[in-house]
Structures are given as structure tokens and as C-alpha cells.
């Protein structure tokens, strides 16, 4: 049984020290597509965290019974089944958000973070640690998504979660929204800025030259 310190490290490590987007550069495509609004960024975070945590748990529970030759197929089947469940739940209880997320919920099946943790961690680690690792990596992914979504929605549309924060000139206010921030390429610059900030604070994350 893992001790509390080890569980805490597995849970909190991916948020900054080993962030899947900022350090490992995984899951960037969805980060570009779903961060124009905080609402979609939050729902995508919850969806990916649930899929990663539960797929890690189930794969870890049967890891000793999966033949090496078909392990990827088994992992994909478990992940795909969980994604279908998540997608159906979203369509049932948050249909408007599900429409905005479009195909990106389905693409969780091929998300490098989910597949990477299943293969590199869950196949070698007991269920509880694997479950916590899934939650930690989901939270790390979400930390970047929500940070980018905060900047893009606030300064691109003057709102957060659809609630007006900065009064727009077009409605008699003072703020002129920056439309560039609502375009997907802006997320590249924001993610790059976050990576730069994190690696300035933690220089040990900078890759060695040569």
C-alpha cells in the first residue's frame, strides 16, 4: 500500500513539476481547440480527468492478465468505452457544451496523455497509485487549459463563464476585446508563455543542449 507522501507526489507532481502539456508537450491539439471559453475548458478538463483516472484504474487491475501482444488493443478498448460513456453523459446533461466541444471529446481516445499514462504507468503500478496518477495528470492538463481559457475569454471577449467582466465598447463600456485571442493560434503563444514562465521558475526542466 502506497504511503501518503507517495500518493501526494503522484497527485500533485503533474500539475507543475511534470505537467503533461508544459513539460511533456502532450495533448496540445485539444488545448488549442477548447480554450476559447472557460466553460468548455473546464468540461474538457473534467472529461479527460475522468477518462484518464478510470482507464488507469481498470487497466492496472487487469495488467497481470493482459498478454503483451494485445495490450495496446485492450487499453484502447477500455479508453474508448469510457470516452463513449463520458460523451453520452455530456450529451444528456450538458448538451450545449457537448455541441461546442464537438469531436474533441471523442478524440480523448487518441489523446497522448491518456494512452501514455496507461502504457507507461498503469501497466506497471498498483490500482490506487494508477488512479491517483490519472487524476494528477488530468489536473495538470486542466491547469494549463483553464489558465489559457481564462486569458482568452477574459481579454478576447471580456467575460468569464459567459458573464461579462469587462464592459465592451460596443455596449457602451470601455474595453475593446482582442479578437485575436479567440482564434486557435493565440493558444500557441499563451501555452508557450506558460512553458517559459514555468521553466524560468524551475530551470531544471530546461532540456540540456547538445
Swiss-Prot record:
InterPro entries: NqrD, NqrDE/RnfAE. GO terms for biological process: sodium ion transport. Pfam families: Rnf-Nqr (PF02508). The keyword Chaperone does not apply. It is found in: Cell inner membrane. GO terms for cellular component: plasma membrane. Disulfide bonds: none annotated. It is a multi-pass membrane protein. It catalyses: a ubiquinone + n Na(+)(in) + NADH + H(+) = a ubiquinol + n Na(+)(out) + NAD(+). One of its GO terms (molecular function) is oxidoreductase activity, acting on NAD(P)H, quinone or similar compound as acceptor. Keywords: Cell inner membrane, Cell membrane, Ion transport, Membrane, NAD, Sodium, Sodium transport, Translocase, Transmembrane, Transmembrane helix, Transport, Ubiquinone. HAMAP family: NqrD (MF_00428). NCBIfam families: nqrD, PRK09292.1, PRK12405.1. NQR complex catalyzes the reduction of ubiquinone-1 to ubiquinol by two successive reactions, coupled with the transport of Na(+) ions from the cytoplasm to the periplasm. NqrA to NqrE are probably involved in the second step, the conversion of ubisemiquinone to ubiquinol. Composed of six subunits; NqrA, NqrB, NqrC, NqrD, NqrE and NqrF. This is Na(+)-translocating NADH-quinone reductase subunit D. The gene is nqrD.
Amino acid at each position: 500500500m502506497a504511503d501518503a507522501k507517495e500518493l501526494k507526489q503522484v497527485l500533485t507532481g503533474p500539475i507543475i513539476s511534470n505537467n503533461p502539456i508544459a513539460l511533456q508537450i502532450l495533448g496540445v491539439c485539444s488545448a488549442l481547440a477548447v480554450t476559447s471559453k472557460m466553460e468548455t475548458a473546464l468540461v474538457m478538463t473534467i472529461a479527460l480527468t475522468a477518462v484518464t483516472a478510470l482507464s488507469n484504474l481498470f487497466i492496472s487491475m487487469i495488467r497481470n492478465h493482459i498478454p503483451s501482444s494485445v495490450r495496446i488493443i485492450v487499453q484502447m478498448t477500455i479508453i474508448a468505452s469510457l470516452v463513449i460513456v463520458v460523451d453520452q453523459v455530456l450529451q444528456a446533461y450538458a448538451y450545449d457544451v457537448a455541441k461546442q466541444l464537438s469531436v474533441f471529446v471523442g478524440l480523448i481516445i487518441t489523446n497522448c496523455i491518456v494512452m501514455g499514462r496507461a502504457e507507461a504507468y498503469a501497466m506497471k503500478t498498483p490500482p490506487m497509485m494508477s488512479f491517483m496518477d490519472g487524476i494528477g495528470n488530468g489536473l495538470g492538463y486542466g491547469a494549463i487549459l483553464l489558465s489559457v481559457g481564462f486569458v482568452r475569454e477574459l481579454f478576447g471577449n471580456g467575460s468569464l463563464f459567459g458573464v461579462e467582466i469587462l464592459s465592451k465598447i460596443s455596449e457602451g463600456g470601455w474595453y475593446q476585446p482582442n479578437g485575436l485571442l479567440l482564434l486557435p493560434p493565440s493558444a500557441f503563444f499563451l501555452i508557450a508563455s506558460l512553458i517559459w514562465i514555468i521553466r524560468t521558475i524551475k530551470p531544471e526542466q530546461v532540456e540540456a543542449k547538445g
